[in-house]
Amino acid sequence: MEEFKRNLELDRSQXHDFIYPLIFQEYIYALAHDCSLNRFLFFENPGXDNKXSLLIVKRLINHLITQIYQQNHFLFSANDSNQNQFMGYNKNWYFXMIFEGFAIVVEIPFSXQLLSSLEGKERVKSHNLRSIHSIFPFLEDKFPHLNYVLDILIPHPVHLEILVQTLRIWIKDVSSLHLLRFFLHESRNWNSLTTPKKSSFSFSKXNERLFFFLYNFHVCEYESIFVFLRNQSSHLRSISSEIFLERIFFYRKIEVSSKDFKAILWLFKDPFLHYIRYQGKSLLASKGTLVLMNKWKYYFVTFSQCYFYMWSQPRKININLLSNHSLDFMGYLSSVRLNPLMVRSQMLENAFLIRNAIKKFDTLVPITPMIGSLSXXXXXXXXXXXXXXXXXXXXXXXXXXXXXXXXXXXXXXXXXXXXXXXXXXXXXXXXXXXXXXXXXRKHKITVRAFLKKLGVGLLEEFFTEEEQVFYLTLPKASYTSGKLYRRRIWYLDIICINDLSNHE
């Protein structure tokens, strides 16, 4: 509060304009409280508290607004046009600050920012987790041999009211909801939220973090019907009397849903389906035949047209035959190898335990695309030699180490499912050497002398830090699937993955 008072004293002429951000913070607190605490901030970790204090959320947002405001308070000169002003400040900066605040608030339940409160607690292992990007298991999970992959590119224009309705089920405070609607519409008047690109639509970079989150959560809510259909239809052909009543229940559900799913309900017979939405694409891998994949293609297109009024572009749907156990996924070629494994598994909830022998697929991420991504960020050369970025040399040594640690963590997150961590270790070593080179350039000494002065403590965090993934559950079932759907979630960091895959 003292920092706000000092800023207020420096800008007495616009004191009435500065009051509004202070009021806006209270709306942010209400949004964060209703979104993250009332709906689904419940950890599946022993010893962790199931509730968080609103004061902690207020301090987090208060720190965010303070830092952004202090960094940009004196950046506007007389060259700024009055036509691009909002509440006395530049619209570009003001809306960027607001949307960044909203993005952090809505990601609080999924973000790894609360991991510090779980130190020393046992965390749930990442087995059979799903992401907000996919209602089905990840391609990196354990699955039998897949034959085909379906690549669908469907435009996703998003109406503003749809985004507001996505948050409506979270927010109990009506004033906060109206405030969010106001900023969304004001942003549309200031700059379009979606920009045409390659016969599709992609969010502008300034707002992609918030709107990708809202869009993926919105689609994920509707896609929960997939879980029910695949869960029940996977054992329809069973002759066991134990599931007779369950089959009757499922047939009654089919009669209710027959108006919307007439000719496509029988497609859900193959339980080995893996699906993900990423960068405007929908990827579906299956063990089925080409005929089955064609019918899945028809279903997904029909689903998008019925629920989201999206019409796919011609030649934007491809069915590729998988060969050599490889799949072009997330910007790099993700290879897998077979490991026989005897498991006692339960594929989905409400399904029966099965003892079967499957082949475990371990993801092998090549080192070349990772080095290419580091090279694009000027952290390494194309030959994997560490390089000191000129921009990092002007920053503090702690900031350079933190940036390199973030790059290493992003590489480790992408290769989390890999059996051999040689590729991730090489990428982490390149990032660590780049941080040391940048710090040595700043102090104008050699890298050897810099490491000798500080010891190996600088590089320990790159190799000794354990996997940090934030796990939680949905205690309240999705409104489209009743009480049958409750899954653990792993939130895929969109920004980090976009940077790692070097996506334009």
UniProtKB/Swiss-Prot annotation:
Gene Ontology terms: cellular component: chloroplast
Domain of life: Eukaryota
Gene Ontology biological process: mRNA processing; RNA splicing; tRNA processing
A Pfam family of this chain: MatK_N
Molecular-function annotations in GO: RNA binding
HAMAP family linked to this entry: MatK
PANTHER family attached to this UniProt entry: MATURASE K (PTHR34811:SF1)
Protein name in UniProt: Maturase K
Gene giving rise to this polypeptide: matK
